[in-house]
């Protein structure tokens, strides 16, 4: 098996694992530990395979999931912060506002949603 195929298989596995663990704190250290590669090597490999930085991909996926929950449910923002592994509601609010240019509570009540900022899951060659 070529190095390229091995890297692709590793990244596919990591993408699946990230999707299964979005509702927990996902640090680069935790993901690299899971992969068995150094943080530096995994980030390089991830960028090469997907065209996205690993940290930004994780943040984008979490923000997308939270945005969808805000549209689809009445779950409190504090609950979403805890559910998706943020240290506090304030941390989630700051991160969300930086990503969507509007705080979560305003995102929920307006009809203007940031679907163009959504990061859908990358899976098996759909990069």
From Swiss-Prot:
**What terms describe the molecular function in GO for this protein?**
bacterial-type RNA polymerase holo enzyme binding; DNA-binding transcription factor activity; sequence-specific DNA binding
Q: Is Transcription among this UniProt entry's keywords? A: yes
What sequence ranges are listed for the domain HTH araC/xylS-type?
A: 12-110
**One GO biological process from the UniProt record?**
regulation of DNA-templated transcription
What's one Pfam family the UniProt record gives for this protein? HTH_18
According to the UniProt record, which cysteines are disulfide-bonded? none
Q: What triggers or suppresses the expression of this protein? A: Induced by salicylic acid, which leads to significant reduction in the expression of flagellar genes, including fliC.
- Top-level division of the source organism's lineage: Bacteria
Q: How does it assemble?
A: Monomer.
Free-text function comment from the UniProt entry = Transcriptional regulator. Represses transcription of genes belonging to the flagellar regulon, including flhD, flhB and fliC; probably thereby leading to repression of motility. Binds to regulatory regions of target genes, including the promoter of the flhDC operon. Represses expression of the flhDC operon in a post-transcriptional manner. May activate genes involved in the multiple antibiotic resistance (Mar) phenotype.
Entry protein name: Multiple antibiotic resistance protein MarA
Q: Which organism is it from?
A: Salmonella typhimurium (strain LT2 / SGSC1412 / ATCC 700720)
């Amino acid at each position: 098996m070529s190095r390229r195929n091995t890297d692709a298989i590793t990244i596919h596995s990591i993408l699946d694992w990230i999707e299964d663990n979005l509702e927990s704190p996902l640090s680069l250290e935790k993901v690299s530990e899971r992969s068995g590669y150094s943080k530096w090597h995994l980030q390089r490999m991830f960028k090469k395979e997907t065209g996205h930085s690993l940290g930004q991909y994780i943040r984008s996926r979490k923000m997308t999931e939270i945005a969808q929950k805000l549209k689809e449910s009445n779950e409190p923002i504090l609950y979403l912060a805890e559910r998706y592994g943020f240290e506090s509601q304030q941390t989630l609010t700051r991160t969300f506002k930086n990503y969507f240019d509007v705080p979560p509570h305003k995102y929920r009540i307006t009809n203007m949603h940031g679907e163009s900022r959504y990061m859908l899951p990358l899976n098996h060659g759909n990069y």
